[in-house]
Amino acid sequence: MSDSLDHFRQICGTAHVLTHEDPSTDLSAWERDWRKRAQGRALAVVRPANVQEVSEVVKACANAKISIVPQGGNTGLAVGSIPDDSGQQVVLSLQRMNKIRSLDTANLTVIAEAGCILQQVQTHVEEAGYLFPLSLAAEGSCTLGGNLGTNAGGTQVVRFGNTRELCLGLEVVTAQGDIWHGLSGLRKDNTGYDLRNLLIGSEGTLGIITAACMKLYPQPAAQLTAWAAVPSMEAAVSLLGLAHERL
């Protein structure tokens, strides 16, 4: 294992490979779930800065038969982003991959890396006059990669759909360490298998999402908030249908 750790340090730099070898290093932020109900133990927390480093780390883990736990903001409540307690798994944290690569105002898309905080993406496009409608309670700490990995819904899911409906393309590192460049902004793409939708919601089991091309919308001219009390579930459904027709 020490050879693998040295290899990780060569790829990402010593400062970005955290282990229990140093007693002063606290890995609990990566090893403990958000509710503090589960605690794992990692062989190492590896923090690559770009897709090439992710690819090299994955190749090194594949060659050494080391399991990988991809991790974004670690805000999930289902204990799906922390290692087990074996001390043999690598937590691959994408937090350093937090750049917004481009904003296409003609195609209404933004390309952002997986480690971008959701609120960071929202603010960036709002300043340019657009809306990225994915919104949820953890938006100040969850990452775009985690949203894609779990196919998050959020508070505007009824109108705009899950994260899957907001994504046009992905950049992914496969289990072999190959890089799939699928950051197409096409609204219609019939070329081959729909790997994008297969990968979204797979929680890192089929590949590691490193960047995504996401849909944007014009900012609404005005917003009104109403509190509506309804007598039954059927009435709530009818009200929703009426809102779709009139708003």
Outline where the language-model segments fall.
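Feature of Fe-S/electron-transfer and energy-metabolism proteins
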Residues: 22-32, 40, 46-52, 60-63, ...
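N-terminal flexible segment immediately upstream of the FAD-binding catalytic core
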Residues: 1-59, 76-108, 137
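Short coil/turn segments at beta-strand junctions that form active-site/ligand-binding loops
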Residues: 64-66, 88
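FAD-binding subdomain of flavoenzyme oxidoreductases
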Residues: 99-247
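Short N-terminal amphipathic alpha-helices
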Residues: 21, 68-70
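Glycine-rich beta-strand-to-loop/alpha-helix junction loops that act as flexible
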Residues: 71-75
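Residue-level marker for well-ordered alpha-helical positions
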Residues: 2, 52-55, 62, 119, ...
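Residue-level detector of anion-binding/catalytic polar loops
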Residues: 66-67, 131
